[in-house]
Amino acid sequence: MIRTLLLSALVAGALSCGYPTYEVEDDVSRVVGGQEATPNTWPWQVSLQVLSSGRWRHNCGGSLVANNWVLTAAHCLSNYQTYRVLLGAHSLSNPGAGSAAVQVSKLVVHQRWNSQNVGNGYDIALIKLASPVTLSKNIQTACLPPAGTILPRNYVCYVTGWGLLQTNGNSPDTLRQGRLLVVDYATCSSASWWGSSVKSSMVCAGGDGVTSSCNGDSGGPLNCRASNGQWQVHGIVSFGSSLGCNYPRKPSVFTRVSNYIDWINSVMARN
């Protein structure tokens, strides 16, 4: 019981998470076409990397939610790959002092995830690190929102990651950020937007044809600032349009984290 309560406090944001050492620059930068983020402004952002031909390569993003747990998307994971997590990095080629590369001890994918039906939802997973990381100005835990929280239309959030700078484009070496406005569920699920592909367990953001997430951003956070100034991870990058990363009326779609708080707590408590 004590362990469960402690984990609940952590993911609810009670342990000084969500306040980066360096202030986020509030501009209209974007991931697609991209603006470089200021180093260490998103200290819970991680690079999930796979071992390929003897080298570690960026595969997906993720968010550190405890000193030994990372939150990411289920579609990022496979039982046939070897993973590690890079934390505290701004440049992937030169992570520098203050970064840490940690092996993975366990992958926990939501039991209802179906890789053949992404639109069904449940695109969420937790990664247990082989050893806890030391928190610092470069490496901090993310805050998660209270269970059931629904963001209003046009709420300002940021997507972050090392995804492609444009559809079929190059991958950046340094972390990017993109300012996105939340699209309410009624609009996003309408026929001229995403239709029935979007469920109420998801969050839509963007859709202006300019700013979006892209391949390589998957699993990373949708960061939204609460009224008290605390940054919370409200979404996990899940999917976008096959027509292009920044196609009009096809906003980036995220797993809505507030729908899975109980699941997150349960997994962390059991493992």
Curated annotation (Swiss-Prot):
Function: Elastase that enhances insulin signaling and might have a physiologic role in cellular glucose metabolism. Circulates in plasma and reduces platelet hyperactivation, triggers both insulin secretion and degradation, and increases insulin sensitivity.
Tissue expression summary: Highly expressed in pancreas (at mRNA and protein levels). Also expressed in adrenal gland and small intestine.
Recorded name of the encoding gene: Cela2a
Keywords: Disulfide bond, Hydrolase, Protease, Secreted, Serine protease, Signal, Zymogen
Signal sequence interval, chain numbering: 1-16
UniProt propeptide residues: 17-30
Matching PANTHER family: CHYMOTRYPSIN-LIKE ELASTASE FAMILY MEMBER, CHYMOTRYPSIN-LIKE ELASTASE FAMILY MEMBER 2B
List of catalytic residues: 75 (charge relay system), 123 (charge relay system), 218 (charge relay system)
Protein name: Chymotrypsin-like elastase family member 2A
Coiled-coil ranges per UniProt: none
Annotated S-S bridges: 60-76, 157-224, 188-204, 214-245
Broad class of the protein's primary localization: secreted
